[in-house]
């Protein structure tokens, strides 16, 4: 999924959650209750709304009593279940105010909780009575005495209590400041460690992708939080219509099945599957676009079939043990860029039922020789004379960067050669780093200036109607384009010649979502980065 916002808005239906939730209802009865409450209130009495309906109350205690009796939401149980103290409680209240989740969702949450972000310290409602509630009373209930010790008046006792609370608040703020400072030191240490470490360990059964921490992987997921990349992907007709045709033309694969959509984005594949007759569809995505996806699902009245879960597939807890079908649009530039296939294979190993299927199921990567002397000169020879100055040293920075662009088919000078065949049902994560010898049959005498790579996608297993699409330069262009590896020193080739070479593909050791590609060709070796 070469797509890369924040979709979290303070409206009903945008919930940072692990499930797609039905929208709360504002019934006429609730409005009537609110009117009755307003009529009975003294003028100027401060009110606060219920967390789950429109009723108003004049104290936190009344509000929580109502939540417990009418909505089966017990704040005492919630605080103890998650070990919430002052700041955790504040975040919880603001999270509910901002995201409007259902009671069922709130009662189903387990750690990690979705209200940990600093943004939930900001009050949603001005003068919210619930934020003035002392959550520590839930841990240490105290009885209010009817007489005051040592001859203190009631006012004096209140003042002393306020001083005690102020001191406790200052202590908590100081502790939070120290915690933030420690956290920053830890982050800096982790960044320094990553930048100075060349090797990540990886076994054949696990992926370094699964081990990435939030601060390491945040840029990747945040890039998918903006609508723009999803618009680009949805408008890619080759991509989107291929998935649609595969699903709609093979409904037997989805009828009454439980389907998992890994990296669901806006939910388009989940909705295709639901329309094809799936019994249940689970969409998982870590990016903020999931909040818009929740609204999209409700707008299309598919919330009874589709459940959306926010988080990494390696970390979330699905509401089912096994699924029948896994679908995902995981492909990146040169197929493997972004390493999202690692996550799909993780999901397959953990959740796919025996006899289940993963789609797309077959993928191939191919190379082809390119001759485009003008473009090579524009990007490489350009540095030999820049306004009369020599800048040839810049070539060392330009050449190692793979270029993603749409090639003119007329620049192709060889037949393609496959270098990798992936069957998603049998491939392991370790197979995604590989070396391959290749031979390119030259079709036209010319100068070879670059080698280009692209991939083809197949929906085949159990399909009555097979669907295939290509990202090659001779096919309709897609948002994946082609990946071009410019040669430092072009060389001549003759028609009919067999140009032999070797390619090695690895994850970047410092950024495993990026790729390192090494080409050996014409007695020369060059390493390229795709990032």
UniProtKB/Swiss-Prot annotation:
Coiled coil: none
Catalyzed chemical reaction(s): L-arginyl-[protein] + S-adenosyl-L-methionine = N(omega)-methyl-L-arginyl-[protein] + S-adenosyl-L-homocysteine + H(+); L-arginyl-[protein] + 2 S-adenosyl-L-methionine = N(omega),N(omega)-dimethyl-L-arginyl-[protein] + 2 S-adenosyl-L-homocysteine + 2 H(+)
Membrane-spanning parts: none
Zinc finger (C2H2-type): 48-71
Region (Interaction with ZNF200): 48-71
EC number: 2.1.1.319
Active-site residues per Swiss-Prot or TrEMBL entry: 329, 338
PROSITE patterns: SAM_MT_PRMT (PS51678), ZINC_FINGER_C2H2_1 (PS00028)
Keyword Hydrolase found: no
This protein's GO CC annotations: cytoplasm; cytosol; nucleus
Top-level taxon in the UniProt lineage: Eukaryota
Activity regulation (record text): Inhibited by N-ethylmaleimide and high concentrations of zinc chloride. Allosterically inhibited by SGC707. Allosterically inhibited by (1-(benzo[d][1,2,3]thiadiazol- 6-yl)-3-(2-cyclohexenylethyl)urea) and derivatives thereof.
Ranges of compositional bias, category Acidic residues: 16-39
Phosphoserine PTM sites in chain numbering: 25, 27, 171
GO MF, one example: methyltransferase activity
Region feature Mediates interaction with ALDH1A1, mapped onto this chain: 186-531
Domain annotation SAM-dependent MTase PRMT-type: ranges: 217-531
Cited InterPro entries: ANM3-like_C2H2_Zf, ANM3_Znf-C2H2, Arg_MeTrfase, PRMT_dom, SAM-dependent_MTases_sf, Znf_C2H2_sf, Znf_C2H2_type
Region (Disordered), start-end ranges: 1-43
Consequence when changing residue 464 to A: Loss of interaction with ALDH1A1
Secretion signal, residue range per the UniProt entry: none
Protein family according to the UniProt entry: Belongs to the class I-like SAM-binding methyltransferase superfamily. Protein arginine N-methyltransferase family.
Quaternary structure note: Monomer and homodimer. Interacts with EPB41L3 (via FERM domain); the interaction is direct and inhibits the protein-arginine N-methyltransferase activity of PRMT3. Interacts with the 40S ribosomal protein RPS2. Interacts with ALDH1A1; the interaction is direct, inhibits ALDH1A1 aldehyde dehydrogenase activity and is independent of the methyltransferase activity of PRMT3. Interacts (via zinc-finger) with ZNF200 (via C-terminus); the interaction is direct and required to localize PRMT3 to the nucleus and inhibit its proteasomal degradation.
Described function: Protein-arginine N-methyltransferase that catalyzes both the monomethylation and asymmetric dimethylation of the guanidino nitrogens of arginine residues in target proteins, and therefore falls into the group of type I methyltransferases. Catalyzes the asymmetric arginine dimethylation at multiple sites in the Arg/Gly-rich region of small ribosomal subunit protein uS5/RPS2. Also appears to methylate other ribosomal proteins. May regulate retinoic acid synthesis and signaling by inhibiting ALDH1A1 retinal dehydrogenase activity.
Domain topic, free-text comment: The C2H2-type zinc-finger is responsible for substrate specificity.
Protein name: Protein arginine N-methyltransferase 3
Organism: Homo sapiens
Gene: PRMT3
